[in-house]
């Protein structure tokens, strides 16, 4: 079976890397050839959220659109189209319409985020909103033979639109994401890896970190915030740009993972639609973490066994103080988290689910 995977972003984006690219090998072992075609190339993605690069980005979007039109020629050799969120970052779902209506190809839509919630980009504002087609996700859900969903919240929304759904959480290869054998000397490292859009969640607990620093020594390591410098008065901070080659190493450098989510900062449904992937990454590395129990983050792992939940600033402070003062507890929770991920979130099991969904979509279309 030949499957054409259409993604918005290149491999540097977690959605493409972990929802498509990492399945190429496992699907091949199951008799399915997955060809991934991103809309943006790596350079355009790197410049996408830099305001000074707006002219370059607009030109790159035009070039990407023309390149995507060429991908239509591949549809005649394709058994199933697998769309990760959307085939193009702007405009109506033209490519998907051609695939389903003109080429009559079965489509599997993969949603790992609440893209059906209206969202205004802090970088592009009204311009970005004008280029977006916010009914696109609903259209794609209705056209898809199957919708693979990153969590239950997304699945419930897709079902409300009449979709057949399959839940496939975003996972990592636990042979790659492994615990670091020996921790370095020095202060305990609190860690967070994210993007410019999720950085406000971390910023919301800066007052907690400042209070914590008055009584405990630690270092706050921030990766991917989208800012050159991050200053938290009274707190030792290491601020790094995200780098694909360094991703696993960055996670391994943490002693405690932070996973704050504040639904009040964006639309509540947008926060609830987050896949909880960071929790899986923390557990795979074998470290304890503290998470706001929102959306999938409330469902993944076992609170009190693999991690702790915190909603208020007081709860964040209490749990951080507990973990900072008890190395044995950190080790126990981290080991439990590692076991949990290996047993319940293996790449092989998710590859089986995806292969079944692709074959089911193909068979259903042939039967109809």
Language model features by range: what are they?
Residues 303-314, 322-328:
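Conserved acidic donor-binding segment of nucleotide-sugar-dependent glycosyltransferases
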Residues 322, 329-344, 350-353:
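A short, well-ordered alpha-helix in the C-terminal region of glycosyltransferases
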């Amino acid at each position: 079976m030949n499957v054409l995977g259409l993604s918005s972003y290149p491999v540097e984006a977690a959605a493409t890397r972990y929802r498509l690219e990492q399945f190429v090998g496992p699907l091949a072992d199951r008799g399915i050839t997955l060809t991934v075609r991103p809309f943006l190339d790596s350079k355009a993605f790197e410049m996408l959220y830099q305001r000074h690069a707006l002219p370059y980005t607009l030109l790159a979007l035009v070039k990407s659109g023309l390149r995507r039109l060429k991908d239509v020629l591949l549809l005649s050799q394709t058994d199933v189209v697998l769309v990760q969120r959307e085939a193009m970052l702007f405009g109506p779902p033209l490519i998907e319409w051609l695939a389903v209506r003109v080429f009559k190809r079965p489509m599997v839509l993969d949603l790992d985020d609440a893209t059906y919630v209206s969202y205004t980009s802090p970088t592009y504002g009204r311009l970005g909103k004008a280029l977006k087609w916010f009914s696109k996700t609903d259209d794609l859900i209705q056209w898809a033979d199957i919708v693979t969903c990153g969590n239950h919240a997304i699945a419930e929304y897709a079902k409300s639109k009449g979709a057949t759904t399959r839940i496939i959480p975003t996972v990592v290869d636990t042979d790659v994401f492994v615990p670091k054998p020996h921790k370095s000397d020095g202060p305990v490292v609190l860690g967070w890896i994210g993007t410019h859009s999720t950085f406000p969640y971390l910023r919301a607990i800066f007052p907690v970190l400042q209070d914590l620093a008055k009584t405990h020594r630690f270092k706050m390591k921030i990766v991917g915030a989208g800012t050159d410098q991050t200053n938290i008065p009274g707190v030792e901070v290491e601020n790094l740009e995200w780098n694909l080659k360094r991703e696993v190493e960055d996670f391994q450098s943490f002693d405690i993972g932070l996973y704050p989510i504040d639904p009040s900062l964006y639309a509540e449904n947008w926060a609830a639609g987050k896949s909880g992937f960071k929790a899986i990454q923390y557990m795979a590395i074998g470290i304890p973490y503290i998470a706001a129990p929102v959306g999938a983050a409330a469902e993944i792992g076992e609170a009190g066994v693999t991690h702790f939940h915190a909603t208020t600033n007081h709860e964040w402070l209490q749990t951080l103080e507990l973990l900072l003062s008890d190395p044995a507890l950190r080790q126990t929770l981290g080991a439990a988290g590692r076991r949990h991920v290996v047993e319940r979130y293996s790449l092989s099991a998710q590859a089986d689910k995806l292969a079944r969904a692709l074959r089911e979509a193909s068979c259903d279309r042939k039967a109809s």
